[in-house]
Regions:
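Hydrophobic alpha-helical segments and helix pairs
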Residues: 1-34
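Surface segments flanking catalytic/ligand-binding clefts of nucleic-acid enzymes
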Residues: 30-161
Length: 161
């Protein structure tokens, strides 16, 4: 059986998939520790692969998070992926107190109950929460972006004085 090295696969992915999808695949390889960022930096990628490399992050827990990170990059605000807030990781902390949570397609049961309890605690402590799901991110991004922009416009990302 022949196997192509992961580096070659990632290069092909960069050239064959749209940017968001390619970045999500590369993010996943980093997140799963299949390769590390210094190794990627040493490889002679060019063209679109070097653009993908410039956009990767090992902090994306899912492809959805990769898509969202890329779609929010233009905001030029402090956006912290996988931030620890009140003892739990949140998908994104925007500014000082706006939290963006992204639920995958299988978000239910015990995990959902735990998330609801954490949401309540976050709100009690002055954080603002936007929770979106798979369908919204993948098929209704303009509505998600509008929610985020409205929250920022209202200053919900800033510390209360």
């Amino acid at each position: 059986m022949l196997e192509d090295p992961l580096e070659n696969v990632l290069n092909v992915v960069a050239h064959c998939l749209p940017m968001e999808q390619a970045v999500a695949v590369w993010d996943s390889a980093l997140n799963k520790n299949l390769i590390d960022y210094p190794r990627l930096q040493r490889l002679p990628f060019n063209g679109v692969a070097s653009q993908v490399l410039a956009n990767v992050s090992r902090f994306a827990d899912s492809g959805l998070e990769s898509f969202v990170r890329l779609r929010l990059a233009w905001l030029k605000l402090r956006i912290v992926p996988q931030a620890w807030v009140l003892g739990h990781r949140v998908d994104y902390l925007i500014g000082d107190r706006l939290i963006l949570l992204i639920d995958g397609s299988q978000h239910e049961g015990k995990q959902r109950r735990l998330d609801n309890a954490h949401d309540f605690e976050l709100r009690q402590r002055g954080y603002e929460i936007i929770r979106v799901g798979y369908v919204e991110v993948m098929f209704d991004w303009p509505a998600v972006q509008l929610k985020i922009m409205q929250a920022i416009g209202l200053g919900m990302h800033l510390k209360k004085r």
